[in-house]
C-alpha cells in the first residue's frame, strides 16, 4: 500500500441491524465506489489521503454522509445504520443503476427490473411486460397468457423462480401461459444463459427469478390500490394490497381481479390453413378471459432470524380462438360466438395454481443458513365439445370416466425442499446448497397426449466467489444432479380396428408403456469480473444439462392446436450444453454502454422433427412429428446504450441478435423453432420538472424487427416490421401519498404485423391492433 493511500472497510445495516446488500458506497472527491455484499460489507483500497467524504444514498433510506479523517493506513469504520424513509412505505424503488452495480459482481448476464418498470411497460401478462429487455421475448397465447423466451429458448429450457421456489406449471405446452400475478411482483432478475449450477435441470437456457416483496417497515399499516383498463380487449380490473408490521411480526395480502373480452387485430380476415375466416369487428372470437389471484404472507423477523410463510392461488379462465382449435376448424358457430365479445365458450381452458411455502433464514456465527419448503398444485383443464375421430364412437359413452366436454386434464402436485449455507473464509464467499423435488402428475379427459408420471430431482452444489482485489473477482461452481422419471402405461378407452395378416381385430391400442428412466449429471461453471474504474468486464463458461420431459419421452397423440401427431422417443438422453458468456459495461455521467455476446453448443439438443408419415388412427391423417436429438450451435448477443443529452432528455438503443443452426440430423443446416429475428429499439425519453408533480416522463419507442427467413417447417417466414409505442406517466402528490398514473399506447400506428414467436403465427394471425392502457396506483398509509 502506498504511503499516500489508505484502506477503508465497513458494514452497512438497516435500523434493525439487518444486512443491506447491493448498496453503493461513494468516497469523494474522486467519486470512488464500492458495492456492499450480502453481509452489508464494503471495502476500498488505495484511497487517496485527501479523500474527505463517505456517502451512501439508497431508495427507501435516508441519505448518510460522514467526514473522513484519514490518519491511519487501514481504517475499520463503525457499523453504519441507515434509517428508513417512512414516506417510501413498503415499496423500495430500485433505480436503473441497481442492475449495473449488480453486474459488477456477477459473471453471468443478469437483467434486473422493478415494479416501476412493469407498470410503465404493462402488458397482458408478466412476460409481455418484460419483453422490452433485449434477449427476452415471449410465446404469447392471446392477450392474457405468455411464457418466457430467453435467447430463443423456452418451455422446459427456462425456469421461473418465485419467492425462492421453482414454479412448476405445465410449461411444456406452447398454449400454456405462466401462472404468475404480475401485480404481486416487486423485483425480477432475468439470467440470460445457463443457470443449472444454481437451479438444476430446466435452467439450461436461463431463469426468471421473482424476488420476494420487501418486508414492511416496523410499526406500519398500509397498502396500495391498482386500477387498469385496456382499450383493445376492453379489459378492466385491478389489485388491492394491504400490509402491516409491528416490531417482529408482519403480514402482506393482495387480491387481483381481471376481466377482458376478445382482443382485436388490424385485419378482418385470417387464413386458418388456407381457409378464410372472417372476423366480426376485427375481434378474435372466443379469446376473452377472467383472472382471480389471491396472495398472503406472514412472518417473524429479528436481527438474526427470519421466517416467512407464503400462500397464493392464481385462477385463470380463457378461451381459445374458436376457428383454430380441433380437427374441424370450419364447423364453428360464428353467430353464437359473435353475440358477445366477453363470453367464454368452448373451447376454453381453466387453470388453478396453488402455492404454499416457507423460507427461514438465520445467522450462526459466520454462516447465513436458509431453508425452504414448498408445495404446489397445478390443475389444468381444457374443455371442448366432443368430436369423434378415427375409431372413437360417434356417441360419447354414458359410463365414461371423464365428462363429455373434458378434452384434457393435467393435475400436478409438487413437494420441494432446499437448504443453503452462505459463509466467508478469508477472501472467499462460499455458498453450499442442496435441493430436492418430488412430482406427481395425473391425467384425465377423452383425448390423450402425454401419460401420467412421477418425477424426482435432487442436486448438490458448491459456489465460491473469490475477491482477489478491488479489481478482480473470480467465480467457480460445481453441481451434481440426479433425476428419475416413471411413466405409466395408457390404453385407449375405445377399440380400434387393426388388420394383420389379412385378419381384422378390435384392440384397445396401447399409447404408452410403463417406463422408468434415471439421469445423472455433473456440471461446472467458472467466471471472472474485472472492474478497472468505470469499465466492467466479465466472462463465464460452463456446462448445463436438462432431463428429457414426459412429452419428449412418451407423447403419442394429436396436438389439436398444431394439427399434428406428436410422438416421443423413450431412449432420449439428457440434453447437455456448453456455453461461453462475455460482458462489457461502461458508465459515465451521461453515457452507459453494455454488450453481452454469447456462444452455445449442444451435442444432443432435443427437438420435434416432422416426418413423411401420417397418422391413420386418430382423425384427419395428421402429419407425424417425432422427438429427436442432434448437434446444435447458437450464438448472438445483446447491446444496450443510453445517453443523457440534457438534464431532462435522454435516448437509448436496445438491440439483440441470435443465430441458431442444427449441425446434424435430418434437419441439418436448419435453425431451431421459435428463433426470434434480430431487432433494434430506439427510445427517447423526456422527464420535465412540473410543479406538484414528480417522476414525470414522456417516451416514444420505435422497434424495427428484421425478417425471419431462417425457419424450420412447418414454420413460415416472417416479414420485417416497424412498430411505435408511446408512454407517459407522473406522480401526483396528495399530502404524504403519491397518486401514480401511467398511460401507454401500444402499436401507435395500428400496424398489421406478424410476431414470429407467437403461438398463432402458423395461421398468419397478426398481432393486436392499437391498445391504450391506463394504469393508476394509489399507495396509502393508515398508520405509522
Role assignments for model-derived ranges:
Residues 13-15, 23-28, 57-61, 71-119, ...:
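Short, acidic, small-residue-rich periplasmic hinge/interaction motif at the N-terminus
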Residues 43-45, 165-192:
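Short acidic/polar hinge/loop motifs at secondary-structure boundaries
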Residues 76-81, 126-129, 144-149, 161, ...:
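N-terminal periplasmic accessory domains that precede
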Residues 233-259, 272-321, 352, 358, ...:
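Transmembrane beta-barrel wall of Gram-negative outer-membrane proteins
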Residues 260, 266, 601-604, 608, ...:
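C-terminal beta-signal and adjacent terminal beta-strands/loops
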Residues 285-291, 304-363, 377-413, 441, ...:
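Flexible loop and strand-edge segments within Gram-negative outer membrane beta-barrel domains
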Residues 399-420, 567-574, 579-580, 585-588, ...:
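Outer membrane beta-barrel strand-and-loop segments of large Gram-negative receptors
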Residues 470, 598-602, 618-708:
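Gram-negative outer-membrane beta-barrel transporters
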